[in-house]
Amino acid sequence: MNRQSVLRLARQTGAFPLAELPPPYLAPSLHFSMNRSTVQCSNFSSTAAVAAGRGDLNKVRGVSAIHRTGPKYKLGVSKYPLPKPVSPDALPKRNATPDHGLWGFFPTDRTALSTPTYDIECGRSWSIQELREKSWDDLHSLWWVCVKERNRIATSDMERKRLKAGYGEWESSERDRVIRVTQNGIKHVLRERWYAWEEAQRLYRKGYRPQEDSQEAIWEMRADSVSNSQGAGQLLVVSKAEDMIDPLRHDRWEKGQEENSGGETEDGNAPSN
């Protein structure tokens, strides 16, 4: 018995009670027909009824790069002329720039792969004592020279691996090691200068002034020279007391002399009233 006959018989007899129906997994149509609502419904649509006749206004609807779906309409290229292949011999030759900056990343013979003889002729690295005597600009220039040279070595190493040359690895690594020692020395010198600058700032905040310290050092040096001269049996003739005093402290010394004299004149007598 088909579905229509079962439904017709159910209408005539007033439908089957649920107890007489087979299980839903055996006859799902019988259960669906009895539980179905009579409310009218329509498919979901977000488009207004008045816009149904205008068609789709989205020109790129359905175009997906993931699913590799092309455009909805065929596109022509007749508007733009297609390029025609040109033989390399017919192309104009370009003159190379002899002083281009990128030549600095290649050896002097301007080849991509440097020879072991060229790599081993690198000399020694800069010592820390030599770098301490250099200025900031010199250290800055030397650092970037090292960076450019290491870039050139890396280019030669990549070309050597690509060609599978089988030689020059030790010479290249040795030259790179010498350059890295120089760079570490530059970092060490700059670190020393940074610590010295921090120490100078700390002393200045505590009230230390290097000018006063230098004047005291000059005074001690003069005192040592006087004691050494007297110890050697030499007579040191000093015409004035000002000769033993630092010029920067001359005013202070004169003020002290006036206070000690108690208002006496140059001849040592008291002033007349």
UniProtKB/Swiss-Prot annotation:
The entry's keywords: Mitochondrion, Ribonucleoprotein, Ribosomal protein, Transit peptide
Q: Where is this region: Disordered?
A: 247-273
Where does it reside? Mitochondrion
- The source's domain of life comes to Eukaryota
GO CC terms = mitochondrial large ribosomal subunit
Family label: Belongs to the universal ribosomal protein uL29 family.
Q: What is this protein called?
A: Large ribosomal subunit protein uL29m
Species lineage, top-down? Eukaryota, Fungi, Dikarya, Ascomycota, Pezizomycotina
